[in-house]
Amino acid sequence: MTQVPVILMPQNTCRATLAFAASCLLASLAICDNAHATLMLPTDALDANLTADVPACHRYDGLQPQGTTSVPISTCETLSPDLGKFRASLTDNGWWIEGGTFLGGTFDLLNHAAHPQLYIGQDPTYRANTYVYITYDLSRIGFAGASQLVFNANVQAFSYAGENPTGFAINSLYISQRFNDGREQVQYGFDELGNQFYGFSLGTNSTTSPAGVGSSIPYEVGFIFNKSAPEINLRLASHDTHFYDRFGVTRSVDPQGPQADWDANNFWGLKWHIPGAGPLYINELGYQLDAQPQQHMMWLRQGVIYNASRFTGFNGGYADGNYAYYMVGDYQLFQTDSTQPYRGFYINAKADYAPPDRNVFAGDIGATFYVLGPFDRPYDVLALGYTYNQLSRSFEHMREASGYTAVDFSRNYALSYVYRLGRGVYLSNQLSYTVNPIPSPKQAPALTWMSSLSLSY
């Protein structure tokens, strides 16, 4: 229910970012002398009730985007894993393709309709998205390491303009190279950096995530979304791959907010520079364990974000830069199926902070209990979450001085369930209660119902 606020930042440049990205790109190309590596294939177990055409899909999954925190659904879980042998032919030539369609709506059950609409669901709110993911194994043409070209594009539509822009966008167009069994990874090109940091999805992939880890702060401080931005990030892991450090540089979102960023970008979403959008730096330290028999899943991470752009201060004047700090953790409390160790009860906890003199959302804490594979349904997800947002009192006082009402906190309670209707078809429902759904003007508590249908193919 919480909206990402509009962020005002004066003009800056990305010259330092672009120089760094260019130097890393040249270094990467310099080591591509006839090297060849095979992408590692996943070893997750098959569901016994899947049809005979499914086993080959594990081979296709080996070409899925590597190293992202927003993992596409397994090819085994699409409507047609083999696509009439089309995927087999693509895989033989180093290609992988997957697509999907998402349809959803949000409705206020307390009938708080308003004109103009002020938040998602206040009036009936609808959204639709169709996307395609394509990868190519670049090690076949001499790139060093396990190398991929990753492309992701979508067409999206929203009935409420305040939720997101409507139109076409390329969300990802980058090269990823992994070395030493994935312990070193470099990625460069165009992407939404939020796909590589923080971990906004709950569950085993982005499709089955019922609610995700919600926080406005990384986007308020400058994470880009909807379209992409030039970026480079480097991930280094320990010998056992459990400890890691990841550093990234990208262009900040446009100073006028997400709609202005969309409008200032070109049709493809691949514009190198947008006036006023300076470089954004992020570093994340983490510890990660996958769910295995006798081993519970654990993912702990903390990160620092710094945006070199100038921000408008709520107390007058400007602030030279902006920053945020986050801590997020997921832990599998216990497993419910030894043959499918990912199934079980989990907890997610998170905390975020940003300085209140230049950010409307100054801090948040939250916890979500979720179950992967409840009720003898291995692909369903159940989640119960709570989030408390501390809002800027400087912003509150500024709005009140202008004659508007404002609040200094919000609370959200959410119950979600993702139901697998069939292979590649998921129905998600969420009931959410929010106290103070927007910072200003003050609104009555909102009780919203969100439903969505996702198709993967």
Please place each PLM-identified region on the residue numbering.
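Outer-membrane beta-barrel "beta-signal"
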Residues: 445-457
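Transmembrane beta-barrel strands of outer-membrane/channel proteins
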Residues: 99-107, 149-155, 186-192, 245-251, ...
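N-terminal periplasmic/intermembrane-space "pro-region" immediately following the signal or transit peptide
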Residues: 2, 7, 32-104
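Short loop/turn motifs that connect adjacent beta-strands in outer-membrane beta-barrel proteins
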Residues: 38-41, 74-97, 109-110, 135-149, ...
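Membrane-embedded beta-strands of outer-membrane beta-barrel proteins
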Residues: 132, 173-175, 232-234, 283-285, ...
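Outer membrane beta-barrel
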Residues: 123-254, 359-366, 373-398
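Detector for outer-membrane/organellar transmembrane beta-barrel domains
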Residues: 290-400
